[in-house]
Amino acid sequence: MDNPPPTGVAPRHLPPGSVHTGKVTASLSHRRPDSVQDAPPAPVPHRAHGRLREVPHIAGLVLGVFAVACLLWSLSPALRFLTGPPRRFVDDYYFDAPDTNVMWALIVGLLAGAIASRKRIAWWLLVGYLTLFAVANGLRFAAEQNINALVAMIVQVGVVGLLIAAWPEFYTRVRRGAGWKALGVLVGGLAIGCLLGWGLVEVFPGSLPPGWQRPGWAVYRVTAAILVENEHFGGHPRPFVNVLLGLFGAIALLAAVLTLLRSQRAANAMTGLDESAIRGLLEHSDVEDSLGYFATRRDKAVVFAPSGKAAVTYRVELGVCLASGDPVGVREAWPHAIDAWLRLADRFGWTPAVMGASEEGATAYRRAGLSALRLGDEAVLDTRDFSLAGPELRQVRQAANRLRKQGVRVRIRRHREIPSAEFEQIMARADAWRDTETERGFSMALGRLGDPLDADCLLVEAVAADDRVLGMLSLVPWGRTGVSLELMRRDPQGPNGVMELMISQLALNSEQFGITRVSLNFAVFRSVFEEGGRIGAGPVLRLWRGVLLFFSRWWQLEALYRSNVKYQPDWVPRFFLFEERRQLPRVAVASALAEGFLPRLGKDPDASAHTGAQSAVPDTLTGLHADGSPPDWPKPDLLDSGPRRPEQVRVRMAKLDRMTAAGVDAYPVAYPPTHTVAAARRSPRGTTVRVCGRLLRIRDYGGVVFALLRDWSDDIQLVIDRERVGAARSAEFGEYFDLGDLIEVSGQIGRSRSGELSLLAADWRMLGKCLHPLPDKWKGLADPEARVRQRYVDMAINPETRDVLAKRSAVVRSLRESLNSWGYLEVETPILQQVHGGANATPFTTHINAYDLDLYLRIAPELYLKRLCVGGMEKVFELGRTFRNEGVDFSHNPEFTILEAYEAHSDYIRMMHTCRVLIQNAALAANGSMVAMRPGADGALEPVDISGDWPVKTVHGAVSAAVGTEITPRTGVAELRELCDRVGVPYQHGWDEGQIVLEMYEHLVEARTEEPTFYVDFPTSVSPLTRAHRSTPGVTERWDLVAWGVELGTAYSELTDPVEQRRRLTEQSVLAANGDPEAMELDEDFLQALEHAMPPTGGLGMGVDRIVMLITGRSIRETLPFPLVKPR
């Protein structure tokens, strides 16, 4: 029966003689599929869903048990004797059960498998056979009045009726194959078997009389002629002769079946068009799978998604439709390709399974209803990180160095660079060095070394000093920057270490070939070998490891793991997927057959040539080549592959296309304006100016067009008078320009008829076409989240946003100028740091590949600035970015700007004055006076005077006032806990006095502070970098500046005693080791610098973003141009 294409796939037959050569001429297009094809597919509806859905399984089971019984009593005389009476009864009335016939046992067994697989042709055979048997029983009853025949007829009629009722459950087809060839093999095999059997009967005739009965007996037993009975003969030969005669027939039938199966596989394997399409999908895929290129293996079949944008390659073994790796093609079309594959398997009664899927592919298959099992891990080398240095790669380094000393070198070439004559020698070496009779691999091997279409593959060879090749690797492309190992060979007589040398040199020299990833071997059940060998592994795990070690004697399971782990690769999981657990044994055997771990009857499938007779390529794919070369598809249109555009955007893009077609450059080169808008507005009437800006409003009154133009400085009205510029030019403005466009306008300053100051436009040109419409002209961006995400739009239409950013710039400039005027030197210290210190905060971590070193993004520049103080800088400051992995709210952002300044021969009192003056100067620069903006009762911002001195309060005094009970640095932990319980302040039981007081301060004092206030003298335990107070024990010389519930800055009298500093940082490092993410680590470099002596120093730290918040009255998200936001 013909093999129909999967749903939605039109068959395409190759013209005669064009399978291996010649190219198909087609339109060079890759048509976009209809939206219906891109819709998510419905789950595959198995048609075995009726009330009688179990009939095929039950019938197949009964026939299977009967076939096994036939085989057993055919081989065992004792069993044949014991089962004689019931066997003869069944043989007479229900089903042929010859006493000794292996051929008949095989026939019934094949029928059982076909019935269980719901094959329609098997249904016809079984129903026809049972019908004939029932008719024979009916005739026998009519002639002999045999009640057993009547009962048997009724049973057979009932079974036939049940099978007819279950007809819809037998829906699977048989693939096209060489039926006549298989029939010829069967007839020829039976003929030879009959001749051999005749000779055998003549030698061992037993009681058979001479003449026609001896050859007749041979034909009867070899062909399993069920219409002939033993009673037709005058005797019988020796019993072992019957077994051999049945075996002759079974061998002939088995040869015919294998011929049919091989022809089915070859006829339905990949065609040149299929391979061409797969190569195109690999080039245009948005997913790079290390096993993707193996989809071009030619003994596989392929099924495409209806759109042609994805495909699944597979092979059928033992009724298992075994897919290999992930689907090929665009990820969005994977579900459609998987759906087509499952429907195909359902149509032919195959059991679907997947070998070697990645985590992403396994997820797609699981969504289609399959179950996943982790099969093992793939070893992947990232060549950018690979180095032979370090103890982990000692074994590889020593092996490679030993061979290099012997003069062995490594040669790496693309296949295209190798002459064909040399490739013949390479293929001969590969065959000679193969350690198995057949080439292993299905999902991770090509099986066609030297094919011209694999020109981009890499060949790595180890060459001895005498030019003798000692080993070789062949690797296939993996996306654009990777290669995947396909073949590995070494000379059995060569030295050890050849593989280590080739792989290490490939990784070290990968850059010249544009390679960043190398996929090595696949380690089956890697976790079992790794974890099962550890101390403390459980008995089940150890037993499972022992079983794998036992089978490793033949299949090299552990050897593959050991050979890969020495390179310290990244282990990427691979998965095995199946439909039902009861199918696992058959699926496992089919997988072992496909991968070459089990011997196969007959020849292996041909993986080097295109043997398929019918292409599975859908009509949506054109420009394919019958020789399998990549198709003539154009490069993907990046605009088409982008996001779906709203209608207004599409309209503007169409307008852009019209402008381009008309020769108008929508994005021209720069030509500076003569005036800003603000300068133009100040110019006398009649002055000719050229200004640039964004169009924010257009009003067309027919004869005259009014528009509003805005640049950073101001707005101005444009007047475009048709009488002045001409009708064509005026119409062009309305045709091409939209709100949001950037425009350059030339003309004279004048006034409109209503007296409004305007620019009377004489000429203009587009500076930048805006492809998105602007928000509502009155409300702007009303959503605060949108204002943050689209800050550029908010700035374009909202003057307040521009004003805040301008004030931020003024604040930063004022801080820098004030410090410069006082003699401070500005420096830059590292942002990437090996030790996080300078503050108690959780850091961000990163990694530098060059040194294979974990680093932190700095939480403070303090420790580096103090080293500069040790070096002699008496006044130094840094204004830069700092990063802390903490919360995001009104006043916190993960990255922020900090100002730290240090002055020698100063203290925290001096820095208090410095801080106040810096903030007041910044307010003056931003607001024009020493005021901070605060929301009033109606929500509008109102100025608050911050000039003059600010209050100063001790921490303990402020907390005492808040709780109504006096506390001092000498107050004990128990009393502080009672106070916390009374006022509702949370605390941890491991905290000391200082930590509890700090928690009370943050909840009761800091959060309730309004006008700027300095809180001084913090507990020593929470100030590890601060000098002890000169007169009050238990506290340090530190202050925090707080205004309206927000901490603005802090300052210390710096701790310069290196011994005390080491003690405090050691305490912090202990906390860090105990899991405190905010505790500082021990910085030996800083401590060593401090031991060289640092002068008494005052240090100041200020959050610049919070200073801007204070001065502008805005949140931190409003004062930053681009605060961090969650991804959409």
From Swiss-Prot:
Pfam family, one: LPG_synthase_C
Region Lysine--tRNA ligase, annotated ranges: 633-1128
Residues holding Mg(2+) 1: D1040, E1047
Chain segments carrying region Phosphatidylglycerol lysyltransferase: 1-632
Binding-site positions, Mg(2+) 2: E1047
Membrane topology designation: Multi-pass membrane protein
Gene Ontology terms: cellular component: cytosol; plasma membrane
Superkingdom, taxonomy of origin: Bacteria
Family (UniProt): In the N-terminal section; belongs to the LPG synthetase family.
Annotated protein name in UniProt: Lysylphosphatidylglycerol biosynthesis bifunctional protein LysX
Species of the source: Nocardia farcinica (strain IFM 10152)
Native organism taxonomy: Bacteria, Bacillati, Actinomycetota, Actinomycetes, Mycobacteriales
